[in-house]
A protein has these predicted regions:
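Hydrophobic small-molecule pocket/channel-lining residues, especially in calycin-type beta-barrels
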Residues: 1-151
């Protein structure tokens, strides 16, 4: 199964509101966000475009690439690269898709970020938890989005 078939229900344009906790990267904020997941490269890739707008008009932009994980042993195994305005070179996050949930873990020298995209009754929820250094895992972002347009 191609990654586009695997993530079919996630494809589309979404917009909503996010609650972001204070972190070493940014102060706490309530933001507006838009994200798009679309198939590309004959369905072998899903591309993600993301835009977050803060009350102070500051923006955070990201471009993601999702591919099937050829070495993944779990059904629905995926790899995700997320390039963003922090200009850090990303390593791949590893994760799985199943039961309407895409769970991914990105690891860097700063720590790890645990991402969960979940489809719930036609809406998309996004949760990001951070583990920085030897600190315990803490909630960082919670978002709720409505589908603006389909696949």
């Amino acid at each position: 199964m191609s990654v586009a078939e695997l993530l079919w229900d996630l494809l589309g344009n979404w917009q909503g509101v996010e609650e972001q906790s204070a972190s070493p990267f940014a102060p706490a904020a309530r933001t507006r966000a838009m994200t798009t997941f679309k198939q590309d490269l004959a369905g072998t890739a899903v591309l993600q475009d993301y835009r977050q707008v803060r009350d102070d008009a500051g923006e955070f932009l990201a471009h993601g690439v999702l591919l099937a994980d050829p070495s993944g042993s779990a059904p629905g195994a995926v790899l995700w690269w997320l390039f963003d305005t922090t200009a850090q070179v990303p390593g791949p996050a590893r994760g799985t898709w199943g039961d309407g949930r895409l769970t991914l873990v990105r690891t860097s020298p700063r720590g790890s970020a645990h991402h969960t995209f979940a489809l719930e009754g036609g809406r998309l929820a996004d949760a990001i938890d951070l583990e920085l250094g030897d600190q315990p895992r803490t909630p960082f972002l919670r978002g709720r989005y409505e589908r603006v347009s389909g696949h």
